[in-house]
């Protein structure tokens, strides 16, 4: 499982930071979080395959998070996409997409499914055998969502228990693995009788644009998240600006990471005012003096991060 930071800037792009977009590669599939302008070109410089993007998660409808959608949707159509593509976002996402695609002429023949998510309560929006995706309402100047991707691990077969019960490799063991019970020597044996608890799966949260929310930290802790991607638009001397614009500072993001219990926090959505990051680095050094175990990274465009 791997993250690729396609764009790590904020409202205005710079020479070094494109508009926000992050891909997550899992089990041969690409999950895209936000799709700012220039996303499809950033993808060219990575190993991300646009044709393997089946789900796009939009945090909110500000232009810097959505204006890459029409180009990306058109390009995969040119490449022959026929498979449906799912787009998740807050209220008005369907109207936004309709308006964008009504500008100019587009040849998009594959199905696009739009799912509008409540920005009032947390929801599990996708559930499969291998992963789950949750939304969480955050506080910004427009309806906004955070997202959490969590890997689902299956129970592990306990060979010691299998041998002790006298179950041989064959049809009975296969039925147990498939979730069915079997009868052996007059005793009913279930999958729970021969398995160990599942290992902890990888869990990563993405804040989108938001003020710092302790409730989001508690949600991440509840889901046992290990990695957090959190916006850090400003350094801590710009706290007033952050409050006025409903964004977060470096210190805000680090504090939410601490409260959530994650091992790693990756800071993104960096304001265009920062040509260099010494102010960010100073804030991190100060925070880590009292919290040395937290792994902190500042995202850069095209940076990759393996999730283990």
UniProtKB/Swiss-Prot annotation:
Cofactor note: Binds 2 Zn(2+) ions.
Binding positions for Zn(2+) 1 per the UniProt entry: 60, 62, 140, 209
Enzyme Commission code(s) on record: 3.1.26.11
Catalytic-site annotation from UniProt: 64 (proton acceptor)
tRNA processing in keyword set: yes
UniProt: Zn(2+) 2 binding residues: 64-65, 209, 269
InterPro entries assigned to the protein according to its UniProt record, in alphabetical order: Metallo-B-lactamas, RibonucZ/Hydroxyglut_hydro, RNase_Z/BN
Catalytic activity, as annotated: Endonucleolytic cleavage of RNA, removing extra 3' nucleotides from tRNA precursor, generating 3' termini of tRNAs. A 3'-hydroxy group is left at the tRNA terminus and a 5'-phosphoryl group is left at the trailer molecule
One Pfam short name: Lactamase_B
Alphabetical keyword list: Endonuclease, Hydrolase, Metal-binding, Nuclease, tRNA processing, Zinc
Example of a GO MF term: zinc ion binding
The keyword Chaperone belongs to this UniProt entry's keyword annotation: no
Cofactor: Zn(2+)
Enzyme superclass (EC): hydrolase
Disulphide connectivity of cysteines: none
Quaternary data: Homodimer.
Role, per record: Zinc phosphodiesterase, which displays some tRNA 3'-processing endonuclease activity. Probably involved in tRNA maturation, by removing a 3'-trailer from precursor tRNA.
Record-stated family: Belongs to the RNase Z family.
Name of the molecule in the record: Ribonuclease Z
Gene source species: Methanococcus maripaludis (strain C6 / ATCC BAA-1332)
Lineage summary: Archaea, Methanobacteriati, Methanobacteriota, Methanomada group, Methanococci
